[in-house]
């Protein structure tokens, strides 16, 4: 972000087409915090927008839809620049599948998972596959559908139920513009004048 600002970029576009509110809030807040942190250290730059944004959650790009990252050809040319496993979002890496136990799975760091989470993994056909967590208990995951997953398979969370619940709150992202109110008395009664922080 600092390099882009110093290169003269004045507007940052977020890829939000067909995305939901949680995705937009998460991505906007992530960039807003990065930009604000830079502006605090560099008084020669100022933001174009008015007001101050506050967020009640810690934004993390891999907790909402994310296809991963590439530096394209910035550092060197690569033979393959695409993600060929799937156009879907794998999500946040949780850990490896330790073993299948009856109708459940034991997963590394399984205690991080919650009821309603969506999990993604790459199956033996090298395709993205997934399950939902019906119940998470003491690191053991009971899925909505029991699928054959090889021990050692990397497990990702691409639907974070607890995070979504926090971000969906109406007060999770708020922008306020400071205003000065002046109440004066005139021959016709009283007049209230409001002036925002930019003098309008």
PLM features: residue spans?
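Surface-exposed amphipathic alpha-helical tracts and adjacent flexible/coil segments at the periphery
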Residues: 1-200
């Amino acid at each position: 972000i600092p390099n882009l600002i110093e290169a003269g970029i004045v507007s940052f576009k977020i890829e939000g087409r067909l995305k939901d509110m949680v995705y937009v809030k998460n991505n906007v807040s992530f960039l807003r915090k990065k930009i604000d942190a830079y502006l605090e250290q560099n008084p020669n730059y100022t933001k174009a927008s008015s007001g101050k944004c506050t967020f009640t959650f810690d934004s993390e790009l891999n907790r909402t839809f994310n296809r991963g990252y590439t530096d394209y050809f910035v550092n060197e040319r690569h033979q393959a620049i695409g993600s060929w496993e799937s156009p879907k979002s794998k999500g946040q890496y949780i850990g490896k599948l330790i073993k299948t136990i009856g109708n459940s799975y034991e997963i590394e760091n399984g205690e991080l998972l919650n009821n309603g989470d969506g999990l993604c993994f790459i199956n033996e056909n090298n395709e993205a596959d997934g399950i939902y967590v019906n119940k998470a208990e003491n690191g053991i995951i009971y899925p909505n559908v029991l699928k054959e997953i090889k021990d050692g398979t990397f497990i990702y969370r691409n639907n974070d139920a607890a995070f979504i619940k926090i971000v969906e709150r109406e007060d999770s992202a708020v922008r306020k513009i400071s205003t000065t109110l002046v109440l004066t008395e005139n021959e016709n009664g009283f007049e209230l004048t409001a002036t925002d922080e930019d003098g309008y």
